[in-house]
Amino acid sequence: MKKILIVVDMQNDFIDGSLGTPEAEAIVDNVIAKINTYTKDCVYATRDTHQDNYLQTQEGENLPIVHCIEGTYGWQLNERVQAALGGAVVMNKPSFGSWELADMMVMEFAGLPAEECEIEIIGLCTDICVVSNALILKARLPEVKISVDASCCAGVRPESHAALQTMQMCQIHVR
């Protein structure tokens, strides 16, 4: 059995920065504990990555809160999460979901029967980047078991954590 952990956007701006929430702060210990249950070669992380022109982008026009500008403190992964990740692969993504991540998972599982493959997803924000990546991965790897650990996720607002129901409807297991 090959099991991969994907840690989505555990960045300072989403935890205690410009888009931070108490719920995001509350999951940091759970996220670190989860990372520590995996070997580092089975852990991937994403980093929301924007440029200085963020407010002129479609996302910036719809969410006019500057965040995760490449190279800033807010863009960096939480220091404790980064330490737990060790040498895990971290990929920048310019949008909510990452096709590059899905392609990497296809390569990770190449030659293995789908029933011997599993992906677990944790991180921020449940209702934007977690759900986007989960659905891209499910579309790209429809027979691979994909799960989300709700105790290691937080939404933009407590009620938007309801994105977990959307994922369940798309055959993503929520724990």
What are these regions (language model features)?
Residues I32-N36, V131-L141:
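Histidine-anchored nucleotide/phosphate-binding helix
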Residues D41, C117, V144:
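Short acidic/polar active-site loop segments enriched in Thr and Asp
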Residues Y44-R47, K145-C152:
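Short internal beta-strands
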Residues L85, M105, F109, R140-L141:
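Active-site catalytic pocket residues across diverse enzymes, especially alpha/beta-hydrolases
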Residues V90-S132, G155-R175:
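Conserved N-terminal glycine/acidic-rich loop preference
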Residues T126, L141, A150-C153:
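Short leucine-rich amphipathic alpha-helical surface patches
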